[in-house]
From Swiss-Prot:
Species per Swiss-Prot/TrEMBL record: Neisseria gonorrhoeae (strain ATCC 700825 / FA 1090)
Protein name: Elongation factor Tu
Family matches, as PROSITE patterns: G_TR_1, G_TR_2
UniProt region (G4), positions on chain: 136-139
Annotated gene: tuf1
Cell compartments where the protein resides: Cytoplasm
Region (G2): 60-64
Keyword Cell division set for record: no
Pfam families: GTP_EFTU (PF00009), GTP_EFTU_D2 (PF03144), GTP_EFTU_D3 (PF03143)
Region called G3, residue ranges: 81-84
InterPro entries, sorted: EF-Tu_GTP-bd, EF-Tu_GTPase, EFTu-like_2, EFTU_2, G_TR_CS, P-loop_NTPase, Small_GTP-bd, T_Tr_GTP-bd_dom
GO-annotated cellular components: cytosol
SS bond list: none
Lineage: Bacteria, Pseudomonadati, Pseudomonadota, Betaproteobacteria, Neisseriales
Family stated for the protein in its record: Belongs to the TRAFAC class translation factor GTPase superfamily. Classic translation factor GTPase family. EF-Tu/EF-1A subfamily.
Residues that, per the record, bind GTP: 19-26, 81-85, 136-139
Length: 394
């Protein structure tokens, strides 16, 4: 059979499983691919195909992640599942697999456990917008009242981290029974798929967002002016558009007088394109790598922010010793390093390699910044951590 063409007809949504170890995240992932494949087509994946997750690198950090896909009536889903707790932490902080929504798997037999709580907190910090709950192993609990108690406990936990606990869909089922072909439990997998379709809104495509291009290089072309190059992160730039140059210095306004790609002139460049943008009346020395071109008023420069960070362990090539308050590494945003001073949370004396922690950072130069922006923490070019901006302070 010929290879199927990737159908772009259905909207594409990124999801992932989160939750405590051994509550059934990988079994549920297998059940979703297997049971939805029967009805909507696609490849079924067995537990052991998902469990031996390959290594991948994101922002200098090695993460084990499994990627599977499945279809529903109306959508195509890309789903990530991680083998270990540390992989989840790294995945969510680096944004290696940006999630439009998460499926929180919680065993009905155990109820919420420490990692259940930690994953919900992480989802909140890194900006996962929606959580849907799958209460797993319900076949092991024969008391309906107990199921109700666990459900209430999960809703309270979600609400305590500012998710709408009362409105989150909660599906009670058993991933293992569904995989074994129990019709009633298979139905619960379809119920979960329907909840994904209806509760997670279709994400806005990158090309529909306001224009942003991180500047990688700057050239001056005699008789034409200054050209900056980079990959358009989102939106579209048209010839004649007003744009702002944001970060590192005072924000400057300019106009795009030309877009070129592969030495050809275009009318526009869009998300994903590597382009050169010609700027009217801008001097070569006014622009540098690390700034961004953006649609006016859509992004502002900041120096102080709160972040959720993962610090590499010694085995991962990170630091061998803890760091303390006033630690001053470089923060690598998009295309450049900026030095910053770290303040720790109240009651935190030090941060050990291998930990994830909330910090406040004050940079020595402003960077175009918004919540959800990812960065690497580096010491002399060596990556020692990764982080995500959870809130902008100043």
């Amino acid at each position: 059979m010929a290879k199927e063409k990737f159908e772009r007809s259905k909207p594409h949504v990124n999801v992932g499983t989160i939750g405590h170890v051994d509550h059934g995240k990988t079994t549920l992932t297998a059940a979703l691919t297997t049971i939805l494949a029967k009805k909507f087509g696609g490849a079924a994946k067995a537990y052991d195909q998902i469990d031996n997750a390959p290594e991948e690198k994101a922002r200098g950090i090695t993460i084990n992640t499994s990627h599977v896909e499945y279809e529903t009536e109306t959508r195509h889903y890309a789903h990530v599942d991680c083998p270990g707790h540390a992989d989840y932490v790294k995945n969510m902080i680096t944004g290696a697999a940006q999630m439009d929504g998460a499926i929180l798997v919680c065993s009905a037999a155990d109820g919420p456990m420490p990692q259940t709580r930690e994953h919900i907190l992480l989802a909140r910090q890194v900006g996962v917008p929606y959580i849907i709950v799958f209460m797993n192993k319900c076949d092991m609990v024969d008391d309906a009242e107990l199921l109700e108690l666990v459900e209430m406990e999960i809703r309270d936990l979600l609400s305590s981290y500012d998710f709408p606990g009362d409105d989150c869909p909660i599906v009670q089922g058993s991933a293992l029974k569904a995989l074994e072909g129990d019709a009633a439990y298979e139905e619960k997998i379809f119920e979960l798929a329907t909840a994904l379709d209806s509760y997670i809104p279709t994400p806005e495509r990158a090309v529909d967002k306001p224009f942003l291009l991180p500047i990688e290089d700057v050239f001056s072309i005699s008789g034409r002016g200054t050209v900056v190059t980079g990959r358009v992160e989102r939106g579209i730039i048209h010839v004649g558009d007003e744009i702002e140059i944001v970060g590192l210095k005072e924000t400057q306004k300019t106009t795009c007088t030309g877009v070129e790609m592969f030495r050809k002139l275009l009318d526009e460049g869009q998300a994903g394109d590597n382009v050169g943008v010609l700027l009217r009346g801008t001097k070569r020395e006014d622009v540098e790598r690390g700034q961004v071109l953006a649609k006016p008023g859509t992004i502002t420069p900041h120096t102080k922010f709160k972040a959720e960070v993962y610090v590499l362990s010694k085995e991962e090539g990170g630091r061998h010793t803890p760091f303390f308050a006033n630690y001053r590494p470089q923060f690598y945003f998009r295309t450049t390093d900026v030095t910053g001073a770290v303040t720790l949370e109240k009651g935190v004396e030090m941060v050990m390699p291998g930990e994830n922690v909330t910090i406040t950072v004050e940079l020595i130069a402003p960077i175009a910044m918004e919540e959800g922006l990812r960065f690497a923490i580096r010491e002399g070019g060596r990556t020692v951590g990764a982080g995500v901006v959870s809130s902008v302070i100043a």
